[in-house]
Amino acid sequence: MEEFQGYLELYRSQQHDFLYPLIFREYIYALAHDRGLNRSVLLDNVGYDKKSSLLIIKRLISRMYQQNHFIISLNDSNQNKFLGYNKNLYSQMISEGFAVIVEIPFSLRLVSSLEETETVKSYNLRSIHSIFPFFEDKFPHLNYASDVLIPYPIHLEILVQTLRYCVKDPSSLHLLRLFLHEYYNWNTLITPKKSIFAKSNQRLFLLLYNSYVCEYESILLFLRNQSNHLRLTSSGILFERIRFYEKIKYPVEEVFANDFPATLWFFKDPFIQYVRYQGKSILASKDTPLLMNKWKYYLVHFWQCHFYVWSQPGRIHINQLSKHSFDFLGYLSSIRPNISVVRSQLLENSFLMDNAMKKLDTLFPIIPMIGSLAKVKFCNTSGHPISKSSWADSSDSDIIDRFVRIGGNLSHYYSGSSKKKSLYRIKYILRLSCVKTLARKHKSTVRTFLKRLGPKLLDEFFTEEEQIFSLLFPRTSSTLKRFYRGRIWYLDILCINDLVNHE
């Protein structure tokens, strides 16, 4: 946030929400370049930093003043040169610049909210693991949950229109629309595997997609928080009203504005909970399956009428929490009864009472994880470790460090698993794969290599927490056993490792 402060002050001194001139400022591209050098593991660098220079930026800006030079025909191949450089390089530079500019209103809003609430910077609130304590607190009291896959917008124009609420500058939106139209196929379906979500343009399109999801959630949660009288109203009334307004081509915003009190009758549920990460969300409720089905068909109609996105009801699955597990953030979670026996004594009579309580059970998904390890050649599909041949040319310390880092990341992320036996199996696969890789490099057998190296190699795979507890307590102590059985949620995990994100 510190890197934005100077530009935010400059932006505040100018006309409100007037972002268009910033696209012609060199410092915007310099800022995008600096952020590219320090980007997270989810936004890998693909060569932009190696090829960019201040001279290229100046030439690009001078040509952008002339529309004929700025517009590049889609009929040209990707290898056609623009000012002597690859077209993809300029596409990436402009998209990075757009991302920085469009982020300015959001950064201003965040800074002002922090100043008003006097909130101290807390990265714990952004941790992925912070979702699971919420599950532990709320979900044991709920009965049904819906797995909702948020559909991608079918047209790029929908992504641009979602920015109009926070970016009041029409020129910026028109320029963004022109850029998207010229560099990408306007009528292409947007999916994560398409080129439009390539790593070179990920920051811009993640921003556009998050704006789209933010608008969807803002309307959904507003209706949830302000609603009344659900059980007095039939769901068919709402659907017929939506279809009527759709036929006469009224915007859905006017539907909510003109007939808002009647619409809200549909949504009342004081026990509903909503959680989302990326494109997957969970809607859980304590009420009956009828209510969950109403929410299901409302979401389908809402996407169709407001975002013009076709979504099938089959994409939303409703399950009973006590009988089905739900897959979220790499964990298989379920609600299980935890029965404790309490002995009570009344005068001379004593009796036993079974006290049943529900608790959240989070399991390590062993089968998908073995599939992920097999995909990157750490083991075969049955889970038998194999050598990583592509790493055999690296130094011994490099090979060990890579395996230890992967094992540490998995142990760190899956520390909240209720049963860690499956996690230990994955760590065993990584250890043996590491030994086989080293043995292959030195043209030796695994047994001979282990005898020569000793047990110190395997000690590298213990996590920092395991090493500390091993020093403080003997292996047979009850404290260490509770550590291995207990769940630990970390509030410093901001992204998911590629091996973890196996969905």
Curated annotation (Swiss-Prot):
Origin: domain of life: Eukaryota
Localization terms from the record: Plastid, Chloroplast
GO molecular function: RNA binding
GO cellular component: chloroplast
The keyword ATP-binding is annotated on this UniProt entry: no
Coiled-coil stretches: none
Pfam families reported for this sequence: Intron_maturas2, MatK_N
InterPro entries: Domain_X, Maturase_MatK, Maturase_MatK_N
Gene Ontology BP, a term: RNA splicing
Keywords: Chloroplast, mRNA processing, Plastid, RNA-binding, tRNA processing
HAMAP family according to UniProt: MatK (MF_01390)
Family named by the database record: Belongs to the intron maturase 2 family. MatK subfamily.
Role according to the record: Usually encoded in the trnK tRNA gene intron. Probably assists in splicing its own and other chloroplast group II introns.
Name this polypeptide is given: Maturase K
Lineage: Eukaryota, Viridiplantae, Streptophyta, Embryophyta, Tracheophyta
